[in-house]
Design a protein with these regions (language model features):
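Flexible active-site lid/hinge loop adjacent to a nucleotide/diphosphate
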Residues: 33-152, 174
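Conserved catalytic and cofactor-binding micro-motifs
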Residues: 154-159
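A conserved segment at the C-terminal end of the G1
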Residues: 3-25
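Short polybasic amphipathic segments
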Residues: 25-29, 160, 165-174
Length: 175
């Protein structure tokens, strides 16, 4: 999640936005560390969202923070779930991957109707979450022939795939 957060923040900053972001190692505004530590909870999100200089927020969100205090925001434009894996089990009432999927789904369920949920097309739990969303859905996969990606694009959906050493965006038959 931290790598994804940093990558998104870097891309947005290079498009001339003033970016604030939170990760498991700190709170940053324009790449300047404002606070060190695990800042993936709602208090850190509020820190970024209340800063008048921040034009674009990228907020890494951990399951523990969601369980304890929620997200720190009500709605967002884009929500990303990179995966749902067993290494995140064992906190509070999260005993299996279905429990974890329910917690992580809170992020993409907060996406505005005209916003985007970006989900792992190779993760069965992410695909299940996608079916219940009312926002736009984009999938990603390292496998250009991933069945979920093929089906999603055949239905006119958008996906990002790794193809011939490049990240390729697909929509329908278009690349």
């Amino acid at each position: 999640k931290t790598t994804t957060t940093r990558l998104i923040a870097h891309i947005v900053k290079n498009n001339n936005y003033k970016v604030g972001f939170t990760t498991s190692d700190g709170i940053y505004i324009q790449n300047h560390m404002m606070e060190k530590g695990d800042t993936t909870g709602p208090i850190s999100a509020e820190y970024i969202l209340k800063d008048p200089n921040v034009e674009f927020a990228v907020l890494e969100t951990a399951r523990g923070g969601i369980l304890r205090s929620g997200l720190g925001f009500k709605v967002c434009d884009i929500g990303v779930i990179t995966n749902i894996q067993e290494d995140h089990l064992g906190l509070s009432d999260i005993h299996d991957l279905n429990d974890l999927a329910r917690v992580k789904s809170v992020v993409v369920e907060s996406v505005k109707k005209d916003g985007w949920a970006v989900l792992n097309g190779e993760d069965v739990h992410c695909l299940e979450i996608a079916r219940s969303l009312s926002c736009n859905v984009a999938l990603f996969s390292l496998d250009e022939n991933c069945p979920a990606i093929v089906e999603h694009c055949a239905e006119g959906g958008i996906a990002a795939i790794y193809e011939n050493g490049y990240i390729t965006i697909k929509k329908g038959d278009w690349k």
